Amino acid sequence: PDLRALGRAAREARALLVVDNTVASAFGCNPLRLGAALSLEALDRVCAGEAPRKLVAASVARSQLKRHRVDAAAECAHALLEGSGLAALDLSSDEAEVLEHGLETLDTRMQAHFDRARALAEYLAANEMVCNVRYPGLTSHPDHAVATGILEHGFGPAVEFDLIDRTAGELIEALPDEFRTSPAGGAITRLSAPRGKQGSTIRLFAGTDDPLIVAATLDNALRNLATL
C-alpha cells in the first residue's frame, strides 16, 4: 500500500497509522519514515528461523515522542501484542543470543531473500503452468510504481501465484517436505496455502537457498501434476 498517502490520511484524521512490517521487514521498508506512528515486525527472519517462540518488535515514530503522544502509540502496541498472546520485554538469554547473532548477518541474509524472491517471481511469471503471479517487483503488478518508492533493497521476500486446474494442497504435497516444514524466516524456501489446501493460491517465502534448484523443483512438481 501507499504508506505515504495512508500516513497523510491518518494525520488529517488525527489517527495513528499502525503498520505490520513483518513481510518487508525493517531492512526492506521504514514505515515510521513514511508516516506511520507505530511499526510491528515479527522477528522470524531476523532470527534466521531459529527463535524458540514468536518474537515481535514494536517501534514508535520520533514524531510521537516529540508530541508527547507516546502513551497512545505504546498502549496500541501493548494491546496488539497482548492480543497475539505475546508478552513484552521478557527475552530469555537464549532468545537474546539468537537475536544478536541474527542481527550480525541480517543485511546479507535479507538481501539474499529479496534477490531470490525476485528471481523466482520472474521464473513463475514466465511459467505457463501457473497464473496471476503477484510480486511488486514485476512491472505487471498494479502497485509496482508505488512499491519502487516505498520498498528498499528490492521488493521483499514473498511471492504469490495461482495454480491452473490444481489445488495448493496437491502442489505442496508433491514437493519435498522441507518446503512446507522449514521454519519461517529460515534458509529454506517455504510454501503455504493462504486460502486453504483446496484453494489454488500458493504463497512462497524465498529462503537463501539456490533459486535455480528451487525453480527446478517447482517445475518438476508442476509437470508431474500436469500428467495426473
Model-derived segments and spans:
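PLP-dependent enzyme catalytic core of the Aspartate aminotransferase-like
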Residues: 5, 109, 166-167, 174, ...
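Generic structural motif
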Residues: 32, 63, 138, 164-166, ...
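Conserved PLP-enzyme active-site core in the AAT-like
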Residues: 1-129, 134, 140
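Short, solvent-exposed beta-strand edge segments and adjacent coil->beta transition regions
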Residues: 53, 96, 154-158, 199-203
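Short acidic, gly/pro-rich beta-turn/loop elements at beta-sheet edges
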Residues: 66-68, 169, 214
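Short hydrophobic/aromatic beta-strand micro-patches
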Residues: 59, 160-162, 205-207
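Conserved small-domain helix->loop->beta segment predominantly found in fold-type I
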Residues: 101-102, 110-111, 118-196
